[in-house]
């Protein structure tokens, strides 16, 4: 309908004109389009309420002026068309410019305003003209439709086309008002619609033709070979009737055989190419592609190529094999470097995420983790890159751990520190070791999530590599953990040693040794080796702390080495009591450590036990059995000459050893049951105490016999036959030789015994208890000494009285007068 222009029908045709076909009215030709390219774009747009001015003087003047401006309007319209995307907008601008241009050129101030009738005639069309125009349009449409193929098939296609237009009305930007508009804008809208439809149709056709391009190119490419085959066929057909000679047949066979050989060579070369070369895609993936599964397939292929290339070395000319192996090694080195860079980037990415506070533990199901582990497996084929990567990991992780550890000792309030001061040495060291243990535990979990895997977790090719390089993967996670945490050893040792060096309290040092033992065991349980510097430093620190305890005890003894320990009350010196307090306090901690008051060498770790025989010998046996006895003897230099001083010395020694034995005896089933040597130390102390008590008893017996006058006779009779060996009266005859001894005469007996015995015996028991044995701190020892002394005296008195009666049977009354106490009376007075 683009040829229908309503401006062509402003004047109704003559009814008498019958020149048209079938009496139809002859329609005028459409007017030519206006040339609007000459219009200038430098104008001010009209206001929306613009009205056509009615001040024209006459119609003819206006029409003449309009014709004069047609050429300028055409140029302006073409320029405007280039700057406006929408046809309707272009036409609206064109109308506005036309009216503006029209008004500026033709409107005069002096032009009289026409009357209403004239204005209506010029501006408003009459109803008669509109009806005539519609009639002409209807006839034209009828003619177009009548000329169209009216078959059912074409009707369906027309209807379908109209429906498609209606369906895509919004997409095509169709405006019905513009399309049916009877003015020039409607004409342009209809032409624009047709242009758009044709353009879209051309695009669809081009799209279809694009699909045929490969086919056309292939046909063109095959045209020449096909033409050549066709020409050869025609030539063969021409010579079909001619007789071929044997030579031609032989040539054909030779050519065919040569062709077969070439085909075989081609197949061999292609097989060799596929076996010993990489394709372009694989080369590009190696040089420019990221690390992914295809890279490992290429590595497997290169490994096989290298293996097969070794067969080429057996050829007479081995240069091809050498070059191939060299090139393969270069390519493998490139891939290994790519894998190494990926693994390092992966670790750095993890470090960055950790520093930003993101998730610290890697998800084992993560795809990148599987790629990381597979890359590590393949990297193990190149030991240099493999070792370099592990060193980078060790350096990176150790620096992170060391920074984290040192950050715990910050002093600013902004830092969240767990270790702030060393006011409590045990707590401080415990916090230090607990921090390290936590870091080790976290590091073990992290390293295991990355580096602990088996051949069962991998695919077939990776499993083969793991099995071939088992020495690199067995215990890899623990090896890395040990290499990483060993960098904490020096910092840990420095922090703990500075506390131990200045700590003098033996109990605190002992608790420190137990902490060090505990955490060294915990570190070992986490996979840290015994020979790791961290564990070795803890053992060294434990030894230092233990030596501090021993040195503190020996120093405590050394300060009292030259002091006099004699005192009027014969009590143990204060330093001995303090020393025993220190020892027993340590023993109590040891018993609590091992869970009770009974344990042996089989129940504890010998390497960590603090009081083996050597230590007990240093802190118990030598100070008491040697130094203490020497000090006591040095305090009483006249003890060898005077029995009274010797008794005082023995009393003091008994008091000291009794206190030592009393304080150490509770540990007989624990500390001193560690082994036989330890038991022997406590037995020696008990033996020394018993021996000293026995010496005191002998001195007290001698003193008692001397004060009763029986001492000389006691010694005399024991020289002949021991009093303790007498069993019955027959043994009395052993002393018959004493009758001839002047000392045994009744007169001398009365002179030497009677008076002393009667004077001292009644007060002997109180004298012993209140004077001689009162300074023994142990009541049981004092009672035992007193009882033994008086029992010995009583036994001798009774036997001596019987022997005298046996020796002097005729003077029994005289004997009874000299030894005037009966046996029962004597026992009563002696308290036996």
Swiss-Prot record:
Taxonomically, the superkingdom here is Eukaryota
What is the role of this chain?
Acts as a component of the peripheral membrane COG complex that is involved in intra-Golgi protein trafficking. COG is located at the cis-Golgi, and regulates tethering of retrograde intra-Golgi vesicles and possibly a number of other membrane trafficking events.
Q: Which GO terms describe its biological process?
A: cytoplasm to vacuole targeting by the Cvt pathway; intra-Golgi vesicle-mediated transport
Q: State the UniProt keywords alphabetically.
A: Golgi apparatus, Membrane, Protein transport, Transport
Q: Where are the transmembrane segments?
A: none
> Entry's SMART domains?
COG6
Annotated compartments? Golgi apparatus membrane
Q: How does it sit in the membrane?
A: Peripheral membrane protein
Instruction: Please tell me where this protein is predominantly located.
Output: Golgi
Gene label: COG6
Q: Which family does the entry's similarity section mention?
A: Belongs to the COG6 family.
* The keyword Cell division belongs to this UniProt entry's keyword annotation: no
Keyword match Phosphoprotein: no
Protein's name in the database: Conserved oligomeric Golgi complex subunit 6
- Give the UniProt entry's GO cellular component terms: Golgi membrane; Golgi transport complex
Annotated disulfide bonds = none
Q: What's a Pfam family this protein contains?
A: COG6_C
What InterPro entries does the record point to? Answer: COG6, COG6_C, COG6_N
């Amino acid at each position: 309908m683009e040829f229908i222009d309503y401006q062509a029908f402003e004047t109704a045709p003559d009814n008498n004109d019958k020149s048209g076909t079938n009496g139809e009215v002859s329609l005028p030709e459409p007017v030519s389009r206006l040339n609007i390219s000459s219009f200038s774009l430098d104008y001010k747009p009209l206001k929306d309420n613009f009205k056509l001015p009615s001040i024209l003087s006459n119609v003819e003047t206006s029409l003449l002026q309009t014709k004069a401006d047609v050429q300028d309007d055409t140029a302006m319209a073409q320029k405007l068309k280039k700057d406006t995307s929408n046809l309707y907008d272009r036409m609206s601008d064109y109308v506005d410019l036309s009216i503006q241009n029209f008004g500026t050129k033709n409107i005069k101030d002096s032009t009289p305003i026409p009357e209403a009738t004239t204005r209506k005639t010029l501006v408003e069309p009459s109803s008669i003209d509109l009806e005539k125009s519609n009639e002409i349009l209807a006839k034209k449409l009828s003619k177009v439709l009548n000329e169209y193929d009216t078959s059912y098939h074409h009707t369906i296609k027309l209807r379908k086309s109209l429906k498609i237009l209606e369906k895509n009305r919004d997409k095509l930007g169709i405006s019905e008002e513009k399309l049916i508009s009877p003015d020039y804008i409607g004409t342009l809208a209809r032409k624009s619609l047709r242009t758009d439809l044709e353009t879209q149709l051309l695009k669809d056709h081009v799209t279809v033709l694009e699909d045929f391009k490969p086919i056309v190119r292939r046909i063109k490419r095959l045209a020449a070979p096909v033409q050549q085959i066709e020409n050869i066929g025609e030539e063969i057909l021409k010579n079909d009737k001619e007789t071929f000679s044997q030579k031609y047949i032989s040539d054909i066979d030779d050519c065919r055989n040569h062709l077969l050989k070439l085909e075989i060579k081609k197949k061999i070369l292609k097989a060799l190419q596929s076996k010993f070369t990489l394709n372009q895609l694989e080369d590009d993936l190696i040089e420019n592609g990221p690390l992914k599964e295809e890279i490992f397939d290429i590595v497997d292929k290169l490994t096989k190529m290298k293996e097969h290339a070794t067969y080429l070395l057996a050829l007479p000319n081995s240069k091809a094999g050498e070059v191939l192996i060299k090139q393969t090694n270069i390519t493998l080195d490139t891939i290994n470097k790519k894998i190494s860079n990926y693994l390092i980037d992966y670790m750095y990415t993890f470090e960055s995420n950790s520093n930003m506070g993101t998730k610290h533990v890697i998800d084992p199901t993560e795809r990148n983790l599987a790629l990381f582990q597979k890359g590590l497996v393949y990297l193990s084929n190149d030991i240099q890159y493999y070792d370099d990567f592990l060193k980078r990991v060790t350096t990176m992780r150790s620096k992170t751990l060391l920074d984290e550890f040192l950050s715990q000792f910050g002093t600013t309030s902004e830092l969240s520190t767990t270790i702030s001061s060393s006011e409590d040495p045990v707590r401080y060291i415990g916090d230090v070791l607990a921090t390290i243990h936590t870091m080790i535990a976290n590091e073990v979990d992290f390293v295991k999530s990355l580096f602990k895997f088996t051949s069962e977790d991998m695919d077939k090719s990776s499993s083969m590599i793991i099995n071939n390089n088992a020495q690199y993967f067995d215990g890899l996670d623990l090896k890395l953990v040990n290499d990483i945490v060993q960098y904490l050893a020096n910092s840990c040792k420095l922090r703990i040693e500075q506390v131990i060096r200045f700590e003098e309290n033996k109990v605190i040092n002992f608790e420190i040794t137990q902490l060090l033992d505990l955490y060294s065991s915990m570190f070992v349980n986490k996979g840290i080796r015994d020979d790791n510097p961290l564990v070795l430093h803890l053992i060294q620190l434990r030894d230092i702390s233990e030596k501090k305890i021993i040195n503190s005890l020996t120093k405590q003894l050394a300060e009292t080495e030259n002091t006099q320990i004699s005192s009027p009350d014969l009590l143990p010196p204060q330093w001995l009591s303090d020393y025993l307090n220190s020892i027993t306090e340590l023993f109590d901690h040891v018993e609590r450590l091992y869970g009770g008051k009974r344990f042996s060498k089989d129940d504890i770790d010998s390497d960590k036990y603090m009081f083996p025989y050597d230590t007990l010998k240093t802190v118990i046996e030598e100070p008491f059995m040697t130094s203490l006895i020497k000090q006591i003897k040095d305090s009483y230099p006249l003890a060898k000459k005077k029995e009274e001083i010797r008794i005082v010395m023995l009393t003091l020694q008994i008091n000291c050893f009794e206190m030592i034995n009393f304080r150490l005896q509770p540990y007989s089933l624990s500390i001193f049951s560690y082994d036989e040597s330890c038991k022997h130390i406590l037995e020696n102390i008990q033996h020394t105490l018993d021996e000293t008590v026995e010496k005191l008893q002998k001195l007290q017996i001698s003193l008692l016999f001397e004060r009763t006058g029986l001492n000389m006779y006691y010694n005399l009779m024991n020289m002949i036959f021991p009093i303790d060996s007498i069993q019955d009266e027959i043994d009395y005859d052993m002393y018959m030789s004493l009758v001839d001894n002047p000392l045994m005469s009744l007169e001398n007996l009365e002179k030497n015994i009677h008076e002393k015995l009667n004077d001292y015996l009644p007060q002997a028991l109180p004298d012993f208890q209140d004077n001689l044995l009162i300074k023994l701190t142990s009541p049981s020892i004092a009672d035992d000494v007193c009882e033994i002394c008086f029992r010995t005296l009583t036994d001798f008195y009774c036997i001596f009285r019987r022997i005298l009666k046996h020796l002097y049977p005729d003077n029994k009354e005289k004997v009874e007068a000299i030894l005037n106490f009966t046996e029962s009376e004597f026992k009563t007075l002696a308290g036996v």
